[in-house]
Amino acid sequence: MTTVTSAPLVRAINWNIIEDDKDLEVWNRLTSNFWLPEKVPLSNDIPAWQALSPMEQQLTIRVFTGLTLLDTIQNTAGAPALMNDALTPHEEAVMSNISFMEAVHARSYSSIFSTLCQTKDVDAAYAWSEENAPLQRKAELMLEYYRADEPLKKKIASVFLESFLFYSGFWLPMYFSSRGKLTNTADLIRLIIRDEAVHGYYIGYKY
């Protein structure tokens, strides 16, 4: 006798019936904050970039490369891992938005590189990021938590990444901006900071 197993029921998301109003609140905040790096006039920073010393340029490129690595992890591993642990389709939707914006953030650093930097210097920074033991260890630790089957620890790790791991890298462009350097680049970073503040808040709230 053949046993027929019915397929699991698939339900469409209904934003008119929500278990947690915070999901809609954060969704609306994220969508109203939407932006793309192409809208920021980074080319206005070319004179300021050229006035930086070679050491300052190298430091800036390396900082942004490190941030790109973290954004890549959050886009491809972190947010998807949290999405898998979501309790409702509304949580899944918010996490999918967060995942996409992390990809936008990573794209933003490439926009900075292509506008201000020489290709050889950027290539050297990417090679450095792959060879730098502390940076790679930081990435490995995040991935260990995201790949494990412990939902609460994933959220804790994600909040740490969305807060001090990112923000420690944001200090340099804010420092330059406070001195009238790379001000348009700093405007782009402020858009990223605005996003990360919401990401960290939401994930921490769900914890």
Please identify what each model-predicted range represents.
Residues 1-207:
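Non-heme di-metal
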